[in-house]
């Protein structure tokens, strides 16, 4: 029986445009789905817009339109952008649908019947001007732990502390600017902690990548809190069935959108919903997500499914973040690039599909879009290697042989090598290691180009006695080109379609790797792909800079990046003097940054693994994400405070503090206002700084 797979990508929020960072996931998923379909798998790709929440409601109010009108407009924009990058959803829906309401309500009622829903009265902050309870992210104030200003209502991006919004000092509503008041409200909680035994087993069953499974152990060690799944009116979403005036929190009904999208698709195509989503379904369910939403997909979602009587995910594949030129995407640098602005500049979407594929390796590592490398790699690989094979040989078929390939091939061994690579390349695609797949394919392209260079068809064409040889050489070259096209088709579907029309062949499937391409009339060759002009990339960056609207300068107290380290241990004003004995208490050590990575759910922090010599490895959270890409830090030496008391943070234990210099005005002229300290050459990990 052939495989049956239901594949999803995370649902983009209907409150903004698709940008190049989003596209990493959708391109990654689309390549995998296209590969599966080429292999003959019954594979369906579902997605939808995530449409509920306070942010949607407030934006619609600001634009003086209904939330429904807003999400319909954004849905049209998203579907247009996805189509522009050849993302081949089988169905793209909306979480604001009858199907989603039905399935979210059924899941909730099943969890309630299972004793996993409890009701508690909690104190919340309430905006007396807008008459609404404020979500955590719509409250700003001073961190109750370190005193940093302008922090969100749930966690501090300076010291990493987590807290209740009611603990925030001097809170202000981000909606109206009013001072919130305390107000009690009944809320509904999913008892996630009661599901821990199941989740511990499920997360170590091979469903997650190894690095994701390891992350789960950290969260288990910290303890699983019950999950608030309700919000008070006014709220744009679905009302809880037995709780008037209470609405499902957006993160409850968002993943249910996967089910709802398929439910509508199944209805339209006569499919059995339970055969795909039922408890005993044999269908593979595969979720592609960003690593920032791993908590929801590896804990909340499987627990919801398990205890509501549904099947569980077969696999949850998380990918890393995108940086551009080694740094976080930036509007001021013109590297916060939307999908539409890329397309509006006339850039080929398959250039980006290829480049992302060349970087994606199936892990949670971040990938970098280096714009200079982007130009060089696409021009070299796709035009200089792949397209070059056809452009140097196809013309002779029409000029000399009436557009028909030879009856046989003279180098069956070389073609056999290309055919034999099909299984290896397929294994790389299956494992989502597209980088390895493309390296294999480009190595074959090099072999094909060497064959053409050795045979010199342009020289053979001058010799009437070599006409038979010319025919065979060009036929062999086009056989190799056809096989390369087949292998690249999941990544370059539009280009593959153009090649299929040029070669006058049916749509390529994976089994076609076994066949020869002879005695076939082909169409006249026309140019298949142009090189990237570096000026077009510069124009895109400039266009994204020019599209910026002026924004107010941030409050001077904000500068979380510059305060990130000092705020962890501030005990006295900076003007106070200390004795040499006080200073001697601080154990400063040289440390080598062995690893650096983004922290899920934190906008400013990086997780650093430090080698401190005889003191061993240390984990430190540093608020330097705005200034450094993780990969730029690995291997560097820096200075750390080694005897700072360990601090339990939301994301794990921080075992010290690295030192950094800061610009008192934050960023100036787009130069990061934060600089980690590095010792002179000769310093080694563990050495004391005196």
Swiss-Prot record:
It is found in: Cytoplasm. Binds 1 zinc ion per subunit. Its cofactor is Zn(2+). A motif ('HIGH' region) lies at residues 12-22. It comes from the Bacteria. GO terms for molecular function: ATP binding; metal ion binding; methionine-tRNA ligase activity; tRNA binding. Its EC number is 6.1.1.10. Keywords: Aminoacyl-tRNA synthetase, ATP-binding, Cytoplasm, Ligase, Metal-binding, Nucleotide-binding, Protein biosynthesis, RNA-binding, tRNA-binding, Zinc. InterPro entries: aa-tRNA-synth_I_CS, Anticodon_Met, Met-tRNA-synth_bsu_C, Met-tRNA_ligase_1, Met-tRNA_synth, Methionyl/Leucyl_tRNA_Synth, MetRS_core, MetRS_Zn. Zn(2+) binds at residues 143, 146, 156, 159. Residues 582-690 form the tRNA-binding domain. GO terms for biological process: methionyl-tRNA aminoacylation. The keyword Ion transport does not apply. A motif ('KMSKS' region) lies at residues 328-332. One of its GO terms (cellular component) is cytosol. The keyword Aminoacyl-tRNA synthetase applies. This is Methionine--tRNA ligase. It comes from Thiobacillus denitrificans (strain ATCC 25259 / T1).
